[in-house]
């Protein structure tokens, strides 16, 4: 009962805050707020420089592999259970998936900086 009440109150509070921010936007914009700022001078180059798509793909690949490696961190505690064979099998499956995905990424030249 307490959990349901807390979830209901949190949901209502979030909806109330979203409604308030939607109906009461900041309407007064000044030219100083919309101008770019670079040490008090006008910027010498555009602020929105394009970044390399190759860098973006390598960064996303790193995040995916990092997340998958983080799944292996509780492995020493999981091996202390009464049935460690299931834990070993699941961890070996995860490591196999990691190796296969790394081999696929390497074969598709997803880790190369230059073309």
Swiss-Prot record:
Can you quote a single GO CC term?
NADH dehydrogenase complex
What enzyme class is recorded for this protein? translocase
Record membrane topology = Multi-pass membrane protein
Key word Cytoplasm present: no
Chain ranges passing through the membrane? 3-23, 55-75, 86-106
Q: Name one Pfam family in it.
A: Oxidored_q4
Q: Which family does it belong to?
A: Belongs to the complex I subunit 3 family.
Record's protein name: NADH-ubiquinone oxidoreductase chain 3
Name the species this protein comes from: Hylobates lar
Underlying gene: MT-ND3
């Amino acid at each position: 009962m307490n959990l349901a009440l807390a979830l209901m109150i949190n949901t209502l509070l979030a909806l109330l805050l979203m409604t308030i921010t939607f109906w009461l936007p900041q309407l007064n914009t000044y030219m100083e707020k919309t101008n770019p700022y670079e040490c008090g001078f006008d910027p010498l180059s555009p602020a929105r420089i394009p970044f390399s798509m190759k860098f973006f793909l390598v960064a996303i690949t790193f995040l995916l592999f990092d997340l998958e490696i983080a799944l292996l961190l509780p492995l020493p505690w999981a091996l202390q259970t009464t049935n460690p064979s299931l834990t070993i099998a699941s961890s070996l499956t995860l490591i196999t998936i990691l190796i296969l995905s790394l081999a696929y990424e390497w074969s598709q030249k997803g880790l190369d900086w230059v073309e």
